[in-house]
C-alpha cells in the first residue's frame, strides 16, 4: 500500500504526539490484543501476560521502537524492517493475521490516548501505515 504525501505527514505528526509514551502505548496495545484475541497468547508461552507485566512492557517497547524506526523511514519500509521480517517469518513463525490484530489494537490505543488528534484522516493514514508495516513483515513468508 502506497502512502501519499498527506499520509506520511499525518503519520509523522501523530507519532510525534505519541512521543515518550510509545513504549507504554505499545504495551497497552499488546495487552488489548491478548485480551481481545486470546489465541495470540500462544506466541508468548514464556511471558507473564498479566496486566503491567515487565515482559509485556518490554515487548511493547520493542514494538514501539520498530514503529518509530519505520516512521523515520517511510520511503524504505522494506529495507528498514527486513531483519524483523526475517525474524517473524523464519524464526518465530508468527501467523500473519496477528499483525492485523496488533495493528487494530494499536489504533484503538492511540484513539483512546489522542482523541483530539485522531481525526478520520489521521486514522486512515495510520491504518495504511500499519497495513504497510504488516505487508513488509509478512513479505518473507513466501
UniProtKB/Swiss-Prot annotation:
Modified residues (Phosphothreonine): 109, 135, 138
Keywords attached to this entry: Acetylation, Heme, Iron, Metal-binding, Oxygen transport, Phosphoprotein, Transport
Binding-site residues for O2, renumbered to this chain: 59
Keyword Transport among UniProt keywords: yes
Any Pfam family: Globin
Tissue specificity comment: Red blood cells.
One record GO biological process: hydrogen peroxide catabolic process
Residues where heme b binds: 88
Xref: InterPro entries: Globin, Globin-like_sf, Globin/Proto, Hemoglobin_a-typ, Hemoglobin_oxygen_transport, Hemoglobin_pi
GO molecular function: haptoglobin binding; heme binding; iron ion binding; organic acid binding; oxygen binding; oxygen carrier activity; peroxidase activity
CDD domains: Hb-alpha-like (cd08927)
Residues the record lists as N6-succinyllysine modifications: 8, 12, 17, 41
Occurrences of domain Globin (ranges): 2-142
Modified residues (Phosphoserine): 4, 36, 50, 103, 125, 132, 139
Modified residues (Phosphotyrosine): 25
The protein's role, per its UniProt record: Involved in oxygen transport from the lung to the various peripheral tissues.
Record family assignment: Belongs to the globin family.
Subunit structure: Heterotetramer of two alpha chains and two beta chains.
Protein name as annotated: Hemoglobin subunit alpha
Gene assigned in the entry: HBA
Amino acid at each position: 500500500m502506497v502512502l501519499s504525501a498527506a499520509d506520511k505527514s499525518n503519520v509523522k505528526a501523530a507519532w510525534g504526539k505519541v512521543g515518550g509514551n510509545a513504549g507504554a502505548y505499545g504495551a497497552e496495545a499488546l495487552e488489548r490484543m491478548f485480551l481481545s484475541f486470546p489465541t495470540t497468547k500462544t506466541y508468548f508461552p514464556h511471558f507473564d501476560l498479566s496486566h503491567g507485566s515487565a515482559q509485556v512492557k518490554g515487548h511493547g517497547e520493542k514494538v514501539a521502537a520498530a514503529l518509530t524506526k519505520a516512521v523515520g523511514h517511510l520511503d524504505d519500509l522494506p529495507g528498514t524492517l527486513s531483519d524483523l521480517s526475517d525474524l517473524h517469518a523464519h524464526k518465530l513463525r508468527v501467523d500473519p493475521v496477528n499483525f492485523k490484530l496488533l495493528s487494530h489494537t494499536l489504533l484503538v490505543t492511540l484513539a483512546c490516548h489522542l482523541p483530539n488528534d485522531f481525526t478520520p484522516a489521521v486514522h486512515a493514514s495510520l491504518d495504511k501505515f500499519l497495513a504497510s508495516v504488516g505487508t513488509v513483515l509478512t513479505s518473507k513468508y513466501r
